[in-house]
Design a protein with these regions (language model features):
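N-terminal export and membrane-targeting signals
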Residues: 1-8
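Catalytic and binding regions of secreted/periplasmic enzymes and modules that target cell-wall glycans
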Residues: 29, 42-43, 63, 67-128
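Export/targeting segments at the very N-terminus of extracytoplasmic proteins
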Residues: 3, 13-60
C-alpha cells in the first residue's frame, strides 16, 4: 500500500512540474520549433538538434531554473544577463528568460557571439 501511495504521489508531482507538451518518443520540444525556426535561418541552426537540446535541458518547461543559475528552455546562465540586456536593448532578467520567445532569442544572440569568437553555436549544449 505504501509503495502504491508513493508511486501515485510521484506521478502527481511529475505532472505538476512538467508541461506535458514534450514529444517524449522523439525527445523534442515540437511546440517550440516554430520559435526556433524564427532564428534558424540567421543562425544556421538545425531545428531538430536545437529542439533535442531544449528537451534535454528543460524537458520543454519554460520556467525551469537549475541550481547552477541556468533558466528557461535552453538554460541560459545568469552570467550572460548583462550582455543580453545590452544586446537586446531591454532588461533581461531571470524572469524574462522564462518567456520562451525571450529565451530562444537570447540563445540566438549567444550563438552569434560564440560564432564570432570562432566557436560552435552548439558548444554550450553539446555533451562530450
Amino acid at each position: 500500500m505504501k509503495r502504491r501511495i508513493a508511486f501515485t504521489a510521484a506521478l502527481l508531482i511529475g505532472s505538476l512540474t512538467h508541461t506535458g507538451h514534450a514529444d517524449a518518443a522523439g525527445g523534442r520540444c515540437k511546440q517550440y520549433e516554430p520559435l526556433l525556426q524564427t532564428y534558424a535561418p540567421r543562425r544556421g541552426w538545425d531545428i531538430g538538434r536545437m529542439s533535442r537540446y531544449m528537451f534535454r535541458e528543460s524537458r520543454c518547461t519554460p520556467h525551469v531554473r537549475s541550481r547552477t543559475q541556468d533558466t528557461g528552455l535552453l538554460q541560459i546562465n545568469d552570467i550572460n544577463l548583462q550582455y543580453l540586456t545590452r544586446k537586446m536593448g531591454r532588461p533581461i532578467t531571470v524572469e524574462a528568460l522564462r518567456d520562451p520567445s525571450t529565451n530562444i532569442a537570447a540563445a540566438a544572440l549567444l550563438c552569434t557571439f560564440w560564432r564570432n569568437a570562432g566557436r560552435s553555436c552548439y558548444q554550450p549544449w553539446a555533451v562530450n
